[in-house]
């Protein structure tokens, strides 16, 4: 008996160091394959998302992420934070930090996490909060083990799976598990799985996906979003719950009906005095469009944007009467208020869900709770009018790049309808510049510039008339014309024409020492006010398609008076480049011996092009930049 126990003790003594070493090696950075470190700032060593659907209104989510951070740029790939609200109960929250050799150097429990409000600027009240750790590394690499478990009653949002979180992060293993013991009907949407070695062992009611040994992907300029290139999984229940409100939807029609009935009805009541005021405002208007414009401008004057996101209020608008009384609301509340005002005069309009900012579509073939913003749709007999209700300054019917050119969900009493917002593409995004320039024999320049912008170019400008004189001057000298040294702005006049959706800038300025002396002669760059500077990065082996996000057209005319005692022997020849990406055309004209005229047209076409076209596009951009820096010699008489 003693001999038996002695052998066990000896075996334990022998195995213990091996066990300790294996535990350390598990998180040691040297334990990863070399290929996973290539082009990587961080490595997903092991990421597990395990979801258990316990009921239509009860779901448990367990997540464990093991991330090795290789350098400073990889810190953002290893966040230790979790968002929650009154509908979420966090049952487990922990983190551990390991050094390069796999030795534990920090250990955090739930009580060690900071707990702060997730309220953004412009939000009055919200129940959204964040628990997070603030960790400052002293050495690289290091490994983070972050683990959470939480419960929620909202099953309208099943966690999605993005096995590759972005560029410059490799994946040793990423796993997604969904357990559905009640066999509730589920729908999935898989994107780009065919381009990656994703293992799928799912069954009709339970899901299991794994991605292993995926090398890091390098970002490329002028490319598609990583969401369009990398694998992703979307999951939704037909029967779901949102903040205590149950629903059913297997298509957009059903979803729209549910949203209209459960979240949007009975919220458009207004007091009698407001109704009378609205009717009085539009009494002389002849068309519904005129009435809608008058009411929209009334709404803009009366309200301002303030976020209101507590409970179902994150999705259900606050009543129109409340917005009318307090003068503020979030996107849902202000959109709903505008709809209520239009209802007073019998103009049909509908709440519309949209993904704002980044150009992203509501997914047509995956009915579910989507979008992060709400706008208003006026059908207008098939000529849709779209209203952004959170801005006090944007023109009637203009969306700008915040919500243009994307699929949206229009919620009607009969159900949801997918529509597409207006496109501001190519020639609709125009900028016309007319400059009168005078050069002096001392090398200085004075000019009067008129610039008119439309489309998305207008969208980038119309806020300028709210800037102070000092900030405006800094905007022109440090941003618009930062390539010109010694620029002094003498006078600025801005005109925002909301009727034509055009913005006009009239500027008088001077530039000291603009002209360069060259022996007895002088040299100057003829393109003073609109030089192209965006030359795409060179890639020896381009991997992804070329994407031009926005098309535009710029037209410039400069009339230049030469300095006394100088002339131009010969003007440069006309240059014209036309290809699938656009047009670049510059022309030179001698008006008389003291005056020349310079005309320039540059257009770019929105589109997605094969990766093989990237080199040609880069060459096009380089030629534009070259000719935009063209110098002309002034010869002394």
Stretches with model-predicted labels:
Residues 23-637:
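A sensor for short, sequence-defined functional sites
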Residues 1-26:
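Bacterial Sec-dependent N-terminal signal peptides
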């Amino acid at each position: 008996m003693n001999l038996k126990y002695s052998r066990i003790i000896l075996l334990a003594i022998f195995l213990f160091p091996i066990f300790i070493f294996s535990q350390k090696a598990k998180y040691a950075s040297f334990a990863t394959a070399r290929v996973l470190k290539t082009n990587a700032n961080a490595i997903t060593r092991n990421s597990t998302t395990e979801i258990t659907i316990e009921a239509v209104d009860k779901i448990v989510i367990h997540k464990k992420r093991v991330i090795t951070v290789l350098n400073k740029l990889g810190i953002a790939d290893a966040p230790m934070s979790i968002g929650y609200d009154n509908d979420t109960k966090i049952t487990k929250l922990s983190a551990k930090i390991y050094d390069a050799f796999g030795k534990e150097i920090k250990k955090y429990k739930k009580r060690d996490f900071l707990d702060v409000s997730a309220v953004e600027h412009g939000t009055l009240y919200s129940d959204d909060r964040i628990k997070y750790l603030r960790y400052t590394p002293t050495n690289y690499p290091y490994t983070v083990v972050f683990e959470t478990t939480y419960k929620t009653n909202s099953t309208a949002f099943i966690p999605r799976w993005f096995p590759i979180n972005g560029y410059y992060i490799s994946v040793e293993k990423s796993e997604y598990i969904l357990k559905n013991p009640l066999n509730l009907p589920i729908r999935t949407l898989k994107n780009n799985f065919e381009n990656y070695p994703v293992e799928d062992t799912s069954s009709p009611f339970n899901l299991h996906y794994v991605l292993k040994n995926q090398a890091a992907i390098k970002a490329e300029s002028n490319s598609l979003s990583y969401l369009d290139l990398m694998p992703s999984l979307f999951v939704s229940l037909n029967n779901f719950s949102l903040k205590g409100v149950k629903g059913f939807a297997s298509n957009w029609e059903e979803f729209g009906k549910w949203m209209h009935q459960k979240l949007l009805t009975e919220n458009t009541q207004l007091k009698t005095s407001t109704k009378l005021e609205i009717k009085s405002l539009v009494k002389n208007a002849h068309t519904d469009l005129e009435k809608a414009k008058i009411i929209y401008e009334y709404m803009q004057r009366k309200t301002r944007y303030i976020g209101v996101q507590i409970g179902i209020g994150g999705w259900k608008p606050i009543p129109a009467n409340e917005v009318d009384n307090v003068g503020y609301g979030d996107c849902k509340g202000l959109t709903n208020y505008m709809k209520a005002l239009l209802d007073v005069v019998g103009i049909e309009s509908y709440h519309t869900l949209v993904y704002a900012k980044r150009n992203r579509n509501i997914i047509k073939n995956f009915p579910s709770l989507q979008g992060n913003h709400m706008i208003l749709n006026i059908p207008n007999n098939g000529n849709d009018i779209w209203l952004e209700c959170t801005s006090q300054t944007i023109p009637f019917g203009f969306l700008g790049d915040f919500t243009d050119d994307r699929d949206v969900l229009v919620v009607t009493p009969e159900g949801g309808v997918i529509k597409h917002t207006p496109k501001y593409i190519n020639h609709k995004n125009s900028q016309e510049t007319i400059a009168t320039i005078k050069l002096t024999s001392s090398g200085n320049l004075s000019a009067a510039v008129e610039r008119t912008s439309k489309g998305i170019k207008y969208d980038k400008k119309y806020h300028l008339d709210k800037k102070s004189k000092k900030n405006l001057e800094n905007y022109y000298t440090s941003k618009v014309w930062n390539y010109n040294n010694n620029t002094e702005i003498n006078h600025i006049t801005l005109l925002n024409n909301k009727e034509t959706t055009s913005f006009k800038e009239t500027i008088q300025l001077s530039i000291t020492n603009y002209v360069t002396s060259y022996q007895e002669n002088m040299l100057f760059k003829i393109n003073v006010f609109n030089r192209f500077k965006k030359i795409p990065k060179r890639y020896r082996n381009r991997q992804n398609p070329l994407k031009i996000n926005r098309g535009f057209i710029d037209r410039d005319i400069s009339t230049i008076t030469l300095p006394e005692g100088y002339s131009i022997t010969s003007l440069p020849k006309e240059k014209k480049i036309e290809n699938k990406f656009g047009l670049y055309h510059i022309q030179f004209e001698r008006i008389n011996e003291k005056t020349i005229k310079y005309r320039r047209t540059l257009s770019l076409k929105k589109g997605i092009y094969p990766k093989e076209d990237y080199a040609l596009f880069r060459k096009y951009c380089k030629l534009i930049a070259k000719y935009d820096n063209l110098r002309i010699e002034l010869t002394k008489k």
